[in-house]
Amino acid sequence: MTEKIKTLRDSAGMRWTALLLLALAMFCSYVFMDILSPIKNLMESTRGWDSASFGRMQGAEVFLNVYVFFLIFAGIILDKMGVRFTAVLSGAVMLFGGCIKFYACSDAFIGTGLEAWFTNHLNWNGELPIIGPILPFAAGMPASAKLAALGFMFFGCGCEMAGITVSRGIVKWFKGRETALAMGSEMALARLGVATCMIFSPYFAKLGGEVHVDNAVKFGVVLLCVALIMFITYFFMDKKLDAETGEAEEKDDPFKSVDLGKIVTSLGFWLVALLCVLYYSAIFPFQKYAVNMLQCNLDLTPADPNTFWGGNSVTWVQYLIMLVVAAGSFSSNFIKNNKALKFGLMGIAVVALVVYCYMGFMRGTAETIFAVFPL
C-alpha cells in the first residue's frame, strides 16, 4: 500500500520544492552580499575607494541590524505577520537596497546633484568618538561609497530578515520529518552563492574587455529579482498549504516585553549567541577582504587572455565543475542502501573538486583561487 497524500507537505516532492524556493532566494542574496569583494581593486581604480571606505561600506550591511536592533524588530514582524508576508517583505527590501547600491556604483551617478550632496555631507570624523568607528559614513569617503553603504544597509535588513524567515518556513514544512537535513541543505545551497559571486563578479565587471564595475552589481540585482520571485511563488504555495489544512497561517504567541527578559537570562541563548559571534566575526570579514589579501600577498600571474585559461569560456566550465562537486556530495547524502552508488558519487565529487582547484590555479587569479573556500 502507498501512503495517502493529504496535504502538500505530506508529499516529499512538494516539501523539497518549497525548500528549493527558499534556498534559491537565499542563494541569490548571498551572491549579492559579497558582489564587490572580488573586485575591490577595481573599485579602487575606477571609483576611488580606499580600503577604509570599502570596509565601512561592507560593514554597513549589519549596521541597522546590530546597532538599531532591526533584527529584533524583524523577529517581531515575523511573529505578528507570519512567514508569507515577511518573506515577500524581506525580498522587496533586499531588492530596494540592491537597486540603491547599483545606482551608486553606476556611471549614471557620476556628476549628479545627489553625488554632490553626498560629497558635502555625512563627513563625520572625530566629533563622534564613541560611535564614530562603527558608522557607515566618514570624512574622505567617495560619494559613491556613501550611497552604496546606504543601500547596503537596507539590503542587510532584508537579507537577515529573510534568513530567520526561511528557517521558520522550513520548520513549518518539515516539522516531524527531515528538518535537520532540510536546514543543512538550504544552508549548503545558499553558501554556494559565495563561490558563484567569486567566479562571476569579476567576469561581468570585465566583460567585453572593458571594466564596468556596475555590471557586476547589475548581475547581483537581477538575482535579487529572482529571489523576490522565489518568495512570491512560495507565498502562493504556502497559502495553498494552509487552505488544505484549514488553518490560518501559523504565528507564534503575541510578543511581550517580558519575553526579552527570559531570553537574555537563558544560558543556552548566550552560548549559542557567542558561538555565532565568533563564527561571523571570523568568516564574514575574511570573505570581504580575502581576494584582495591574496592579490597583495601572492605573486599571481593571470593567464594570457588569448588562451583557454584566460578566456571567458573557462569561467563557465569551472562553474559547471563546481556544480558537479556540489551535486555529487549533496546527492550522496540521500543514498542509504546502495553503498557503491553512494561512494561513487562521493568519488566523482572529490575528483571534480581536484579539477576545480587545478583550474583555479591555472587561471592565476585570486578570486578563482579563493572560490575553492566556500566548497
Specify the residue positions occupied by each region the protein language model found:
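Cytoplasmic helix-loop-helix junction between adjacent transmembrane helices
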Residues: 145, 151-189
